[in-house]
Curated annotation (Swiss-Prot):
Molecular function terms from GO: rRNA (cytosine-N4-)-methyltransferase activity
Binding-site positions, S-adenosyl-L-methionine: 35-37, 55, 79, 100, 107
Claim: Iron is one of the keywords in the record: no
Name this polypeptide is given: Ribosomal RNA small subunit methyltransferase H
Catalytic activity field: cytidine(1402) in 16S rRNA + S-adenosyl-L-methionine = N(4)-methylcytidine(1402) in 16S rRNA + S-adenosyl-L-homocysteine + H(+)
Gene Ontology BP term (one): rRNA base methylation
NCBIfam families assigned to the protein according to its UniProt record, in alphabetical order: 16S rRNA (cytosine(1402)-N(4))-methyltransferase RsmH (TIGR00006)
Family classification: Belongs to the methyltransferase superfamily. RsmH family.
Enzyme superclass (EC): transferase
Pfam families tied to this protein: Methyltransf_5
Gene: rsmH
Sorted UniProt keywords: Cytoplasm, Methyltransferase, rRNA processing, S-adenosyl-L-methionine, Transferase
Source organism of the structure: Burkholderia pseudomallei (strain K96243)
Primary location group: cytoplasm
Amino acid sequence: MGNEFQHRTVLLDEAVDALVTRPDGVYVDGTFGRGGHSRAVLARLGYAGRLIAFDKDPRAIETAESIEDARFEIVHDSFAAMKGALDARGIGRVSGVLLDLGVSSPQVDDPARGFSFRANGPLDMRMDPTRGESAAEWLARASVQELTEVIRDYGEERFAFQIAKAIVARRAESDRLGPLDSTGELAQIVGHVVKTREKGKDPATRTFQAIRIHVNQELADLQVVLEAALSLLEQGGRLVVISFHSLEDRIVKRFLQAHASAPAVDRRLPIRAADLPRPPLKLLGRMFPNDAEVAANPRARSAVMRIAERVAP
């Protein structure tokens, strides 16, 4: 397979250092991508260690299948299927779960995948192009209200209503102009609506992010996998999550904080702190790429990595 679209793994050493606590453990890479984290984890594991990786992208699966290592297995599915997939393999507990969220550089850089507003391509945006509804198919049927809600909530775009109306107006011209099915035309529509400019950011950035998140159910899947990871982690096991925008990070932060805090109790009740159940997680902090990594890989700029450890059985 060609490697014309390269991917630089963000926070590679930092993530693996945080994740791997014992070489003979079972680990999960929820987002194989092009395998940067997985290969680094395998390098840390001993003979008895094991790594199960997940990815929806068929091209990622092709890359993973080139890894000849008996300790490694790739699953062609969303990380939201993690619990069921591990149950089917007789794995009830794991030593660590790594999630590197969002879209990978090869997906963005390949115009044929339909993620990018910088180069024209088919309006697809599916991480697995063989499953589900494409962006073009969704845009062809969504109401102004649904479009507005998605673009506003997932893109944090203040011109969401105006963009939604412009998309529906263009759709009404489909008999004359053909379907809205290219990234270039969608970016052009958004650019005509969004007159203000954020420094260093294309006006279509927020809308494309929103549609991509919706098409791939990214935030819903994130909620599912966080719960799955918590249930799978053994005592001392680590959860390491790298996110790239505020919506993802907010979900991760709130989840970790909720499971690292003691339950609230009315102070008037005769209950001691020692009598309360111990929170399952301990927060081990967050990390950001250093200046050198950002200089070498500008896409790392927005990354934040959060780490938690399971401390209660």
